[in-house]
Amino acid sequence: MDKITVSILIPCRNEEKFIQGAITSVLEFEDPDQIIQEILLIDGMSTDNTKNIISELATTDNRIKLLENPHKHQAAALNIGIRQATGDYIMRLDAHAVYPADYLILCQTTAKKSGADNVGGIVIPKISQSYYCASLVHALTTHKFGV
C-alpha cells in the first residue's frame, strides 16, 4: 500500500493572538513518515493581522497555504478546505489551540487500531487571560455536561 497523506484544515477568523502558536505546533508534529501533505488555513475575511501572520509562516514551509472564505463562517471554511484538499485524509484543527507533538501519530494509530473513520483528542483548555468569559468557557468545556 502506498503511503497515506493528510491535509490539515484550520478554519480561522481574527486569530492573530493564537494562529502562530497553532501553526507552530502543527509544524512540530512528529511525522516520521512525512504524511502531512498540506496545511490549509481557511481565513474568514479577518480584519486583524491573521492573514499576514499566515503569509509570513507560509514563506518558511511550502505546505502552508492560505485560502479565502468570503462567507466568514466555519462551516463554509471547512467546505472550502475539503474541496481544495489533496491528501487521502483530512485532519481538522482549531486555530486557537496548541497541539502536542504526538497528536498526529496518536490519531493515526487510533484510527488504524479501531477502524474508525473519525478520531480526535481530548480538549484541555488553558486560560491565557483572566477574563470572565474565558473562565466561563473553561468551566463549560471541562465539566462533564459541558461538552
Would you name each region that the model predicts?
Residues 69-85, 106:
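Glycine-rich, basic loop-to-helix element that forms the pyrophosphate-binding segment
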Residues 90:
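Short aromatic/hydrophobic "clamp" motif used to bind/position activated sugar donors
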Residues 24-35:
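Short, acidic, metal-binding catalytic loop of nucleotide-sugar glycosyltransferases
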Residues 4-7, 38:
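Cell-envelope/extracellular polymer assembly enzymes that use nucleotide-activated donors
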Residues 25, 43-52, 94-97:
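A conserved acidic beta->alpha catalytic loop
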Residues 102-134:
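Conserved donor NDP-sugar-binding/catalytic core segment of glycosyltransferases
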Residues 35-45, 67-70:
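Short beta-strand/loop segment that forms part of the nucleotide-sugar
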Residues 17-20, 48-56, 102:
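Acidic helix N-cap motif at the loop->helix transition within catalytic regions
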